[in-house]
Amino acid sequence: MLDCPRLALLCALPWLLRAAVPGHRAEPLKRSAELPRNPRDPARGADFDRVYSGVVSLSTENIYSFNHTSHPGQVTAVRVHVNSSSDNLDYPVLVVVRQQKQVLSWQVPLPFQGLYQRSYNYQEVSRTLCPSKATNETGPLEQLIFVDVASMAPHGAHYKLLVTKIKHFQLRTNVAFYFTASPSQPQYFLYKFPEDVDSVIIKVVSEKAYPCSVVSVQNIMCPVYDLDHDVEFNGVYQSMTKQAAITLQKDFPDEQFFVVFVIKPEDYACGGSFSIQENENQTWNLQRSKNLKVTIVPSVKGSVYVKSSLFSVFVFLSFYLGCLLVVFVHHMRFQRKPVDGSFGSGDGSGNMAVSHPITASTPEGSNYGAIDESSSSPGRQMSSSDGGQPCHSDTDSSVEESDFDTMPDIESDKNVIRTKMFLYLSDLSRKDRRIVSKKYKIYFWNIITIAVFYALPVMQLVITYQTVVNVTGNQDICYYNFLCAHPLGVLSAFNNILSNLGHVLLGFLFLLIVLRRDLLHRRALEAKDIFAMEYGIPKHFGLFYAMGIALMMEGVLSACYHVCPNYSNFQFDTSFMYMIAGLCMLKLYQTRHPDINASAYSAYASFAVVITLTVLGVVFGKNDVWFWIIFSAIHVLASLALSTQIYYMGRFKIDVSDTDLGIFRRAAMVFYTDCIQQCSRPLYMDRMVLLIVGNLVNWSFALFGLIYRPRDFASYMLGIFICNLLLYLAFYIIMKLRSSEKVLPLPVFCIVATAVVWAAALYFFFQNLSSWEGTPAESREKNRECVLLGFFDDHDIWHFLSATALFFSFLVLLTLDDDLDVVRRDQIPVF
């Protein structure tokens, strides 16, 4: 064991060796050791708000001491500014700030890493020191702050030092505060919740979009992460161009937090362009400063949540009351009518004079392929005069029965019946009612299966998204309207979810209405009611049930989408929008063509193809011309193929098994017969007009997409569906009026309500409060304040109105042909 003199000599050996180095001066270290004994030394008596200049090198280090006092109830902070004229990254000026509980250090020039290994170096750096809080128990808190300035430069590096006290460090409620920040001069401030405030919204505004910035909210802890590379390590944060907003609950320790503002060295995170850097070590000082305004305002109280929730429920429950009132009025009117003949006298007296049950005999001389009908039937008269066969006199005794083809399958051959010039509903409702009803029930059961398998993974995914947002604090994951996003529990925007309640409630109400009609129709069939069996549009409710389920699922999936709306889950609710539009078109077609509608399997397979194309369009449709060429070709060809099937009532077939060019001869013959030989007037004029207009609309969509290539491909595809649906509905109503059919008051009311509500809904839809097509910061530029009850924004109103408009649209389809319930099916034209 070493004795004491030898141990003391060994401990002093490093200092002796340092003193023996030629040219080395130990004076700064000596001054540091003598600071308490030399009152004239600047390391002891440094003052706030005074600029200190100096040179540091390998042999010189300067230490400044500042005395800072904190008083109870007052939170003050200190800010250190360091500037260096040197741009040598190999020998930067090193700054170390020592406080009572922490150490903060940085270098000047301060480097920032950008994309693709770009480097941005700043010669002027300002940092705010973590404040110390004095309590009433301890009284004023006095502490020393040491600022060490050093460098390893062999020839010295110049610097300037300024230490100031921040006068306005604590933000106040409803008071705007203006300041400036840059990448090397971040800012943060303190906010403490007032006693009567449970939640607040931090609103940050800037007049210019760039430079890109980040707003962060962090717990009161040191160090504060206020640089670009570490601001995402703690708290809640979001990128910003012109505005940002963060809603916070009163669940922070000591009910206070830091609001941190960081300017990014590059703008790519906010959608900006790259900066061209000529010199690898180029320094940046004032080029990326940004003026900001921050205002912290109280958010809505809990009573607003309750009031808004009750408002949403009662608004849509009023529809239930309205439907009950309509049912009661109809019931009372039905009870007042006499039993005998009452059904026809009130709603269809104009047709009852000639309407009677279909007989089993066929009038002599009826046209080839005609249905069984009485001599007074307009359908028979039109078929006999325009059917294309020569007209024979019914009284011509020279006509032998053997002159006619009496094959028994003539009256059931689809190729004969569906190619007649004038078709009536009885021609296309010849199949067994039970079989057809089961066929349409498949739509209902299939959509339930699709909904379950579709919704469960969606719910799991959005819950994962919300969990990631809550755990990481990264609010750039979801594209909310942050100026009107009211959290509840783990949900960040409860108001966007609540506003979808209307789809579910109105969808369920529509199912109840359809169920009532279905039960009444079944009772009529069980009672052998002649009007239920042979009059009016055949009642098949499978598609209506499917539409009701689709409306409910639209609400569920829209709510799931709004849990965390972003680029990855937009198709959650748009998928059922496509299905709703498609089901409505199928229902319109099925009304007058009950026997030849598409099967549920092919219909849902078509929807799957549409959704697949939509996803591909969102991924590839922004810049790839080849996708638009392929999609436009598919769109045009699909329109032509569907038009052909509709024009020929599904009876157009080409024998592809003929290998000696028979397919082309068949196509040429059809073209010659229907387009050239009869060019003066198509065989089916009404259908031809509809299909020409429909093809022009679809070709216009295809041409528009090919030329302009819209970025929002999902909305573009939805526009195609909606325009086709509106076109078909308008054609249906026009043809109905042209056929001298009536539109009862209830469907007239539904049509008017549908038009008015859809117009209002589309106004709010196009407000564009956010958009996942750009960056999160660009999306926040479109954010706006709440407009209804201080709780709902424009998009929430779109949810309310669109649910109502869809409900009325469904009622239009359900009630439009109620006037035909007293008209024989062989008198109802097909169009």
Curated annotation (Swiss-Prot):
It is found in: Membrane. One of its GO terms (cellular component) is plasma membrane. InterPro entries: SID1_TM_fam (IPR025958). Glycans are attached at N67, N83, N136, N281, N470, N566, N768. Residues 354-408 are annotated as: Disordered. The chain crosses the membrane at residues 309-329, 442-462, 494-514, 541-561, 572-589, 600-620, 626-646, 688-708, 715-735, 746-766, 796-816. GO terms for molecular function: cholesterol binding; double-stranded RNA binding; RNA transmembrane transporter activity. Residues 330-441, 515-540, 590-599, 647-687, 736-745, 817-831 are cytoplasmic. One of its GO terms (biological process) is RNA transport. Residues 20-308, 463-493, 562-571, 621-625, 709-714, 767-795 are extracellular. Belongs to the SID1 family. PANTHER family: SID1 TRANSMEMBRANE FAMILY MEMBER 1, SID1 TRANSMEMBRANE FAMILY MEMEBER. This is SID1 transmembrane family member 1.
